[in-house]
Amino acid sequence: MVVAVYPGTFDPLTRGHEDLVRRASSIFDTLVVGVADSRAKKPFFSLEERLKIANEVLGHYPNVKVMGFTGLLKDFVRANDARVIVRGLRAVSDFEYEFQMAGMNRYLLPDVETMFMTPSDQYQFISGTIVREIAQLGGDVSKFVFPSVEKWLTEKVAAMAQGPSA
C-alpha cells in the first residue's frame, strides 16, 4: 500500500488544490492532505478552520485523509508511513523553491520520493494569496473556490471588517 502526503497551508483550499487531490488520490492507495500550522506565514484562517474547510471539500474522497500538523514535514511523513510527498507546481517560478525543498526532503528522508504535479490548465493561475486578496477587496472568487469555501471567506472578511471584537 503506497501512502502519499500532500502538504500545504491551504489558506484557503482552492479548486486547484482539489484538482491535485482528485488526481493524486487516483494514483495512491492513501493520500494524506497535511494542513500545516504555518504560523510564520500568518494564515488568514486558523488551523482549525482550514481543517474544517478541507474536510468539507475533500471529505467525499474515500482514500483521502485530512490532518493538521506542526513542526517538520519529515516527522509528519514518517508518522503517516508515507513513501511519497506530492507537491503542486503552478508555474516555473514555483520550481526553484520546490526543487530546493525536494532536495532537502531527500536528504532528511532518503527513502521518500517527491512527486511534482501541475494543475489542470484552468487552475494554473490560482493561488490562495490571490484568492484571499480578491475576497478582501469584495471581488468574486466563485470560479476559484468551492461554494463552501466562498462562504467561509465571506464570513471571515465580514468579521474582520467589524473589528477585533467580532
From Swiss-Prot:
EC number of this enzyme: 2.7.7.3
Annotated Gene Ontology cellular component terms: cytoplasm
Top-rank lineage group of the source organism: Bacteria
Sites marked Transition state stabilizer: H17
Subunit structure: Homohexamer.
Protein name (database record): Phosphopantetheine adenylyltransferase
Keywords: ATP-binding, Coenzyme A biosynthesis, Cytoplasm, Magnesium, Nucleotide-binding, Nucleotidyltransferase, Transferase
Annotated ATP binding sites: 6-10, 17, 88-90, 98, 123-129
Catalysed reaction equations from the record: (R)-4'-phosphopantetheine + ATP + H(+) = 3'-dephospho-CoA + diphosphate
Species annotation: Burkholderia pseudomallei (strain 1710b)
Protein localization: Cytoplasm
Entry's family note: Belongs to the bacterial CoaD family.
Function: Reversibly transfers an adenylyl group from ATP to 4'-phosphopantetheine, yielding dephospho-CoA (dPCoA) and pyrophosphate.
Pathway entry: Cofactor biosynthesis; coenzyme A biosynthesis; CoA from (R)-pantothenate: step 4/5
One Pfam family this sequence matches: CTP_transf_like
Cofactor: Mg(2+)
One GO BP annotation of this record: coenzyme A biosynthetic process
Gene: coaD
Molecular function in Gene Ontology: ATP binding; pantetheine-phosphate adenylyltransferase activity
